[in-house]
Regions:
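Acidic, low-complexity intrinsically disordered segments
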Residues: 2-260, 272
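A structural motif corresponding to the C-terminal lobe/cap of the Radical SAM core domain
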Residues: 5-16, 69-70, 88, 252-256, ...
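Glycine/serine-rich loop-strand microenvironments at binding/catalytic pocket rims
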Residues: 62-69, 212, 217, 230-231, ...
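Conserved N-terminal glycine/acidic-rich loop preference
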Residues: 70, 75-79, 111, 285-287, ...
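Conserved beta-strand positions
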Residues: 75, 103, 126, 278-280, ...
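Radical SAM [4Fe-4S] cluster-binding motif and immediate context
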Residues: 26, 185-375, 397
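Glycine-/small-residue-rich active-site loops that bind phosphorylated ligands and cofactors
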Residues: 53, 80-81, 107, 283-286, ...
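Radical SAM enzyme core and accessory elements
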Residues: 2-11, 44, 62-65, 71-72, ...
Length: 538
């Protein structure tokens, strides 16, 4: 406790030592939102991001903990970063044995039992952290115990895990939490500098290329929605608030005027910004009354000088929620990249993902976005549990076609069994889940973590794994000798690595020489070295 009798809270973001593989290098927005809410309530709070340290993250965290007296250390967890998050949790426990160590985030919400089994946690927060942490701070001020806090799980003396549900934040509560985000305190400059170095911006051959890269790097993220309700079977985030509440949570999001207020706040707080990224899993709905007024409000704010005329925007959208009218309005407002969760170009696989309804919208809406000068960014999963080899071939061919037309693509080879996702819970798929043995550094604790849901067809599974092995070999060599490769280049690598393997099974995807030439042309630096590497590895 500080002199005023208020607890001190240290919030630690998810730790991705391979930053860019599981996360994007940016301030952990959910953690900063929690910090803003706690600070507004008079709770001294600090954010520690292990992905943006000037020294080893473990050493930096040790220094941070030793330099303060922390009553609570909160550890954020995700499925992909869990072993690293747990490493920091155990480190915090060793350095601050009297502090409450609290887990939160996606993985903690779906697997509180695993948190207590593997970690040194006193408490696990389920779902949104604002209300439970405020309640925890109130109890610590009053010298009360932590039992019975809604939205938490704890382990009893006899080893049972007792979970208490909580209602998701309503619209006003969500609005207040978002407006509490302390953008003025967030060290974006440090992140931008690291990204510019990683992407070797100074080595780009033209001013236009450098400016385009800076527009992508100097971005600030804004969340305006509590969750995506679409129920994709591979997704865990769609079930996050339902799990914490114990029932279906209501949707809540900012309205157009509130979005504009936040944009103006962000610009004032971070004047070097080039792009606002709306980090909502789904920015617009089919029946959406916000998108057109928001675009008009942005255009008006630019004309009035309230925000810079050059400010650009990126969002993730339902492709079946797009129309030429909406796309035109977004282009005029300054949207330059539109993310679309296409996931797969096979109608059969889309049905398996609970996305069959988007199939007929893909071709016309991608074409319309490109014709208006915007860049669609497509998220793809190369295979599904019930995919055929033809499904894989269709997605590879279409991915290559849309890359040539101007889209950018991020690609995964198979479904990852995220905790809480419908496919991860499907017992019929259990024989096709591959596990990876994970170890928590510095502890000797290990466990088997689900890592891949492979196609049921053994031929398809073998093909996908062979493509993955080839991709990993080539990616490792390229990134060690050239530069960090963004997803747009990784997608070309996936396609290149698939060509010979798919051809063995009678599926022509594209010309190898053409794909290789396209990769050479896009490599960010040291093209001669990269050319030799690719030729040697393919």
């Amino acid at each position: 406790m500080n002199a005023a009798g208020s607890p001190s809270v240290l919030l630690v973001g998810p730790y991705d030592p391979h930053c860019g593989e599981y996360t994007f290098l940016a301030p952990p927005l959910g953690v900063w939102r929690l910090a803003g809410v706690l600070e507004a309530a008079g709770v001294r709070t600090k954010v520690f991001d292990p992905n943006c340290c000037s020294e080893l993250p473990q050493r930096a965290l040790e220094r941070e903990i030793l330099n303060g007296t922390w009553d609570v250390v909160g550890i954020s967890t995700t499925g992909m970063t869990l072993r690293f998050d747990l490493e920091l949790a155990h480190l915090a426990r060793r350095i601050a044995p009297s502090a409450l160590i609290v887990a939160g985030g996606m993985e903690a919400t779906f697997r509180p039992d695993l948190m207590f089994e593997l970690g040194p946690f006193d408490l696990v927060v389920l779902g949104e952290g604002e209300r439970p942490l405020l309640d925890l701070a109130t109890r610590l001020r009053a010298g009360q115990g932590v039992e019975g806090i809604s939205g938490t799980a704890r382990r009893t003396a006899d080893g049972r895990v007792v979970s208490l549900s909580q209602r998701a934040l309503n619209r006003q509560e969500l609005r207040d939490a978002i407006f509490s985000i302390p953008y003025e305190q967030m060290p974006y400059a440090a992140y931008w500098e690291r990204l510019e170095t990683a992407y070797r911006v100074g080595a780009l051959p033209s001013k236009a290329a450098r400016e385009a890269q800076l527009a992508e790097i100097r971005s600030v993220r804004l969340i305006t929605l509590n969750y995506c309700p679409m129920g994709c079977t591979f997704c865990s985030a769609t079930n996050f608030l339902h799990e914490a509440q114990g029932s279906v949570a209501s949707i809540a999001r900012l309205d157009a005027d509130e979005c504009l207020q936040m944009i103006e706040r962000i610009v004032a707080a971070q004047p070097r910004i080039r792009t606002v990224i709306f980090q909502d899993d789904i920015f617009s709905y089919t029946r959406d009354h916000r998108i057109l007024p928001l675009c008009e409000g942005i255009a008006t704010a630019k004309r009035d000088g309230r925000i810079p005329a050059h400010l650009q925007f990126i969002s993730t959208n339902r492709i079946d929620a797009m129309s030429v009218e909406r796309l035109t309005a977004m282009r005029r407002a300054g949207f330059r990249v539109l993310g679309f969760g296409i996931e797969n170009f096979s109608q059969q696989v889309l049905g398996e993902f609970n996305k069959a309804q988007i199939y007929r919208h893909i071709e016309p809406m991608l074409s319309a976005a490109l014709s208006l000068g915007m860049t669609p960014f497509l998220d793809l999963i190369l295979s599904s549990p019930r995919a055929s080899l033809e499904d894989v071939a269709v997605t590879l061919r279409e991915a290559h076609r849309w890359l040539l037309r101007g889209c950018e693509i991020g690609m995964y080879p198979y479904v990852i069994p995220f905790s809480g996702a419908a496919l991860a819970k499907d017992p019929s798929l259990a024989p096709h889940v591959q596990y990876v043995e994970r170890e928590i550094a510095g502890t000797g604790i290990s466990w088997s973590q689900p890592a891949k849901i492979l196609p049921i067809d053994p031929v398809v599974a073998d093909v996908v794994l062979r493509i993955e092995r080839s991709f990993e070999l080539m990616l490792g060599s390229l990134e060690s000798d050239v530069a960090h490769l963004p997803s747009r280049l990784r997608s070309l690598l996936w396609i290149l690595c698939s060509l010979r393997i798919m051809a063995e099974h009678g599926h022509y995807i594209a010309s190898e020489s053409e794909v290789r030439a396209q990769l050479y042309a896009r490599l960010p630096a040291l093209r001669s070295e990269a050319t030799g590497l690719v030729a040697a590895l393919v």
